[in-house]
């Protein structure tokens, strides 16, 4: 998944949700168990989907699609007209999911990042 100890900590996610209070969603079962979530936001110009997850036992039931659609509507309501995201190239299921939803791969781009603090990967 690409998680790390700083921005994916409870404090990091809380800070993110405070900055983006209307564009991220969770889905709960009737028993109150979270089985899906999406973290998304925008910079005033472009929307970004940062994390999307559905528990393995609840996949292929439309939960991910419903979460994405809710986020896209929320971003559109805030005047955002284009949304971007990053998917690991080796994530075949994830890439197929986003392609089915109309997200196209971009050629000619190289994704780069730089940690400003020491981080530890906590990939699941």
Task: Place the predicted regions along the sequence by residue.
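Glycine-rich acetyl-CoA-binding "A-motif" of GNAT/NAT acetyltransferases
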Residues: 29-36, 93, 106
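Conserved acetyl-CoA binding element of GNAT-fold acetyltransferases
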Residues: 45-56, 85, 110-113
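Conserved beta-strand in the GNAT
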Residues: 32-41, 48-53
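Active-site rim helix/loop that mediates acceptor-substrate recognition in acyltransferases
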Residues: 2-29
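Conserved acetyl-CoA-binding loop-helix of GNAT-fold acetyltransferases
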Residues: 51-56, 60-73, 96-100
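Conserved GNAT acetyl-CoA-binding A-motif
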Residues: 68, 75-87
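Conserved acetyl-CoA-binding loop of GNAT-fold acetyltransferases
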Residues: 99-108
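Conserved beta-strand-loop-alpha-helix junction that forms the acyl-donor binding cleft
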Residues: 85-94, 113-117
